[in-house]
Amino acid sequence: VHPGDAKGKMISAMLAAIDFNALLPENEIPACTEGYEGFYHLTEMSGTVEEATLSYIIRDHSREKFEQRKQAVAAAAEEIDRKYGRGTVELTLRDSYYNMKEKLADCMFLIWDAEKALREVGVEPVIVPIRGGTDGARLSYEGLPCPNLCTGGENYHGRFEYIPVEDMELITKMLATLCWNLAQEYKISRRSARSDTEKPPGSFGPG
């Protein structure tokens, strides 16, 4: 539609996109939340009068609240359709990460072992929520429980992201200590298993 003849006809995709974003809670974004508070994160937007695209990341440590956030996005899409006409919004939701706590609850020894290794290299562990998706979260839901370990870096995902060499060396030492401790535990468990199945001298037959 030509802008000179647009009255009552033109629907600007970009303005509809702005309206869509305005329907989401303005204070529930990364810049206004912390700790275990969830958020909506607009990561990319592009468009013309005819077509516009908004890309979001939705995060929440609570599965229930996570589902509620997805419902809120769907409700926003329905509201835009009511305002501009059905079919205005094409909504795609794709789950990528969940809170790995659900998968680690039955194998907390993985975290305890990591804490032990940190202390052995002189670092007191600090447990903080990871406010984003991680490879460990995906691996945990693929059947390989994988808690997040620190790297020593700072300012992640920013242009000033960095990691001191000293921190890398310390974390490398911690990982080596963790592997050594796990290897020793494995040897002990193997030795114990063999002892349970070995027959005492002079015994015959099964059992």
Segments predicted by a language model, with ranges:
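A short glycine-threonine-serine/GTX helix/turn-capping micro-motif
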Residues: 1-8
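Metal-dependent amide/peptide-bond hydrolase catalytic core
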Residues: 8, 12-192, 202, 207
